[in-house]
Curated annotation (Swiss-Prot):
Record GO biological process: DNA transport; transport of virus in host, cell to cell
Species assigned in the record: Squash leaf curl virus
Job description of the protein: Binds to the genomic viral ssDNA, shuttles it into and out of the cell nucleus. Begomoviruses use 2 proteins to transport their DNA from cell to cell. The nuclear shuttle protein (NSP) shuttles it between nucleus and cytoplasm and the movement protein (MP) probably transports the DNA-NSP complex to the cell periphery and facilitates movement across the cell wall.
Family recorded in the similarity comment: Belongs to the begomovirus nuclear shuttle protein family.
Subcellular location: Host nucleus; Host cytoplasm; Host cell membrane
The entry's keywords: DNA-binding, Host cell membrane, Host cytoplasm, Host membrane, Host nucleus, Host-virus interaction, Membrane, Transport, Viral movement protein
Motif (Bipartite nuclear localization signal): 21-42
Highest taxon above the source species: Viruses
Span list, region Interaction with Arabidopsis thaliana NSI protein: 150-187
Protein name as it appears in the record: Nuclear shuttle protein
GO molecular function, one term: structural molecule activity
Length: 256
């Protein structure tokens, strides 16, 4: 009946005491010569680019984001890549500041639910979109993300309060839940989706890091993230034949 798919202190210089001595002549020429022979350490040290606040945007839509009744899918928010063009990152880590999302949810009646001889019954259901932080991201042996059921226990929990199953709480935590209770009389219904989630504040900083093992793989996909990945879970529950399509734009503000 159910189906699931995936997708840097302060530096201090101590001054030495200067004692005046008579009868002693010093040759400063040698000292000046030594200064000239000293290597210019600053010029040989590679200065890293300054980290700046930037924003990266990602649109999640298409056939893979269409949910049939009683189904769910899991995906991730793509982080910036280590490139020269902005938005980018200049380190193997970034500070996650805030994520905003805005989009549309479209609920459609299934073809088999149409009644020819009378009015169609209402389609009722619950849609959930959950933003989750993965503290220690890594691809499992199956090569996929944890499913909705594996992370939250069962899709039916969307009717109440979602929580991460005890076995996975050390790795995952919920950052935001968007929930819409739907009652559809016509064939289609459009619902607005929007929200903002703070990832860092004055008391806590959320940093993400990357492996960046090879030049070609210095990107922001889940497989290259080693700390604090952002996952998104979508779920549509309904007893009637129907489908839910999502188009959601994510904007991630970060220091990188």
């Amino acid at each position: 009946m159910y189906s699931t798919s995936n997708r840097r202190g302060r530096s201090q210089t101590q001054r030495g005491s200067h004692v005046r001595r008579t009868g002693v002549k010093r040759s400063y020429g040698a000292a000046r010569g030594d200064d000239r022979r000293r290597p210019n350490v600053v010029s040989k040290t590679q200065v890293e680019p300054r980290m700046t606040i930037q924003r990266v945007q990602e649109n999640q839509f298409g056939p893979e984001f269409v949910l049939s009744q009683n189904s769910a899918l899991s995906t991730f928010v793509t982080y910036p890549s280590y490139v020269k063009t902005v938005p980018n990152r200049t380190r193997t880590y970034i500070k996650l500041k805030r994520v905003r999302f805005k989009g549309t949810l479209k609920i459609e009646r299934g073809q088999g639910d149409t009644i020819m001889d009378g009015p169609s019954s209402n389609i009722e259901g619950v849609f959930s979109m959950v933003i989750v932080v993965d503290r220690k991201p890594h691809v499992s042996q199956s090569g996929r993300l944890h499913t909705f059921d594996e992370l939250f226990g069962a899709r039916i929990h969307c009717h109440g309060n979602l929580s991460v199953v005890p076995a996975l709480k050390d790795r995952y935590y919920i950052r935001h839940v968007t929930k819409r209770v739907v009652s559809l009389e016509k064939d289609t219904l459009l619902i607005d989706l929007h929200g903002t989630t703070q990832l860092s504040n004055k008391r806590y900083n959320c940093w993400a890091s990357f492996s960046d093992l090879e030049r070609d793989s210095c990107n922001g996909v889940y497989g290259n993230i080693t700390k604090n990945a952002l996952l998104v879970y979508y779920c549509w529950l309904s007893d009637a034949q129907s489908k839910a399509s999502t188009y959601v734009s994510f904007e991630l503000d970060y220091l990188g």
